[in-house]
Amino acid sequence: MTQFNPVDHPHRRYNPLTGQWILVSPHRAKRPWQGAQETPAKQVLPAHDPDCFLCAGNVRVTGDKNPNYTETYVFTNDFAALMSDTPDAPESNDPLMRCQSARGTSRVICFSPDHSKTLPELSVAALTEIVKTWQEQTAELGKTYPWVQVFENKGAAMGCSNPHPHGQVWANSFLPNEAEREDRLQREYFAAQQSPMLVDYVQRELADGSRTVVETEHWLAVVPYWAAWPFETLLLPKTHVLRITDLTDAQRSDLALALKKLTSRYDNLFQCSFPYSMGWHGAPFNGEENQHWQLHAHFYPPLLRSATVRKFMVGYEMLAETQRDLTAEQAAERLRAVSDIHFRESGV
C-alpha cells in the first residue's frame, strides 16, 4: 500500500490562529496555466513625481499641501473609512438584521519622500524610522481605541491606488473579525497549555528550520505550516512581546533588518516588485493583561508561478475552504534559495 507523503498527496493543515483548515494539493503544482496573467510594473519611477498626491511638497486632491518631509509623513486619510463622531446606531432585537456603530480613524503613512523606493530598497535606518512611526501611531491611537491596525497594500495587484510607497493605520472602536478570532483562539490555547501559542510556535519553527525564510538575532520569518497564500509569511519576535509598542531599541532596529531581508527575498524571487498585503497583529488595548497574545506580522502575497501568474481565491476557496498547491516547506525553500540583498542593490 502506498504510504502518505505530504510532498505528493493532498492533505489538510490546521491554522490554530483562525481555527480553519487549509487544503494542500502539491501534485497540482505541475498543471499548465492558460488563465489570466498580471502585468508586472516595469516603469522606472522618479524620486519625486510632481503629480503624486503623496510626494513631499505636493498638493493633495483635497487642496491640502504636504510638507517637505524628509522621513515618514502621517496624515488623516482624505477618504477615511471610519469617522470618530459616528452616532450610535438604534438597537434592534432582530437576529437577522443586526447593526452597530463603527467609530475610528484612518491614517496614511508615507514611508519616505522617495517616490521610487519600496520597503526592500530603503536603508535599514529608514526602515527603523518606519517601525518607530508604527510604534508612535499605535501608542497614540491605542489610548482611544481598542484595536489599531497597521498595514500596507503593495502593488496594483493588491489594490494599491497610489504607487508612492505608503502604508495605513486604522483605529477601530471594535475588535475586527480577524483580531477577534485570533484573540479567542490564542486565549483558549493559553488556558489549555499555560503558554502563548505563537511563543511555542516560534520554538517549534526554530527547532525545525524547514519553513524558515529569514532569521535575525531577535526575529524569525517563516512560511507558516498552515499558509494559505503561495508565499505567505509570518514574522515573529523570538521572545514574548505583546505589542509593537513594547519592542526594545535592539528589537526595533533588528526588525528593520528583518523587514529588509524578507521583502528583498520577495522581490528577488521573480525579479519584480513583489505585491503583497501585510499588517501587524498585537494585543488589543482593552485593559486586560493579554498574556495569551504574541506580536506578529502577516505577509499575504498573491504571486504563484512567476511575476505574471497569481493565486486566485475563488470557487472552492470561497464556497468550501482555502486550497494551495505548493507546500509551505517548498515555498520556504524557494525563498531561501534567493539572496536577501535586493537585486537592484546587488547589480544582478
Residue spans for each PLM region:
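Acidic/histidine-rich, metal-coordinating catalytic segments
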Residues: M278-G282
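Extended C-terminal subregions enriched in glycine
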Residues: D254-S273, S277
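A contiguous, surface-exposed recognition patch within enzymatic or periplasmic domains that forms
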Residues: L242-Q251, L255-K260
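Active-site microenvironments that recognize anionic phosphate/pyrophosphate groups
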Residues: M1-H164, W170-L242, A250, S264, ...
